[in-house]
Amino acid sequence: MSVKSKQYFNIFIFIISLIFFDQLSKYLVVKYVKLGSVYFSFFENFFRIIHVRNTGILFSIGSNINYSLKKIFFLAMPIFILIFIFSLSLKEKNRIARISLLLIFSGGVGNVIDRLFRPSGVVDFLDFKFYGIFGLDRWPTFNFADSYVVIGMILFLVYDFFIKRKAFNT
């Protein structure tokens, strides 16, 4: 197997593993946790597993938008953006930047799968107490795909601001 083929194979395994874990966790929540109920909580309600559905995007933004517009803005556009991110990740030479783009891609695909096959909305289940910060008693409920996107974005920003700029300035 050539170096390039091995690299693409590793990328494929990484993406499939992340998407599988995301979809498996959502499947288990749908199967075992009644919609709207708390399955269990840890550390005096600091962290809970709860089954909710999100028909909007980040933090339920746009959940009241017309169904046809949702298909365009929450399905078609993300698919085009994901294709773009994936193509960038294949061209990226820096390992941190590539991993961050692949995390964003995998998280996006995980939520697009929900939008395609779960008309009642994306399954969210990770719920944290937020102690009134920004006026929120609890952080908006999310899933592993959301975590991949956020971690990927943070990694990419760290890469862009610290690593890429440092290399550019030397």
UniProtKB/Swiss-Prot annotation:
It holds the Pfam family Peptidase_A8. The keyword Hydrolase applies. GO terms for cellular component: plasma membrane. It catalyses: Release of signal peptides from bacterial membrane prolipoproteins. Hydrolyzes -Xaa-Yaa-Zaa-|-(S,diacylglyceryl)Cys-, in which Xaa is hydrophobic (preferably Leu), and Yaa (Ala or Ser) and Zaa (Gly or Ala) have small, neutral side chains. Pathway: Protein modification; lipoprotein biosynthesis (signal peptide cleavage). InterPro entries: Peptidase_A8. PROSITE patterns: SPASE_II. The chain crosses the membrane at residues 9-29, 72-92, 96-118, 143-163. It is a multi-pass membrane protein. It is an enzyme of class 3 (hydrolase). GO terms for molecular function: aspartic-type endopeptidase activity. This protein specifically catalyzes the removal of signal peptides from prolipoproteins. Belongs to the peptidase A8 family. HAMAP family: LspA (MF_00161). This is Lipoprotein signal peptidase. It comes from Borreliella afzelii (strain PKo). The lineage of its organism: Bacteria, Pseudomonadati, Spirochaetota, Spirochaetia, Spirochaetales. The gene is lspA.
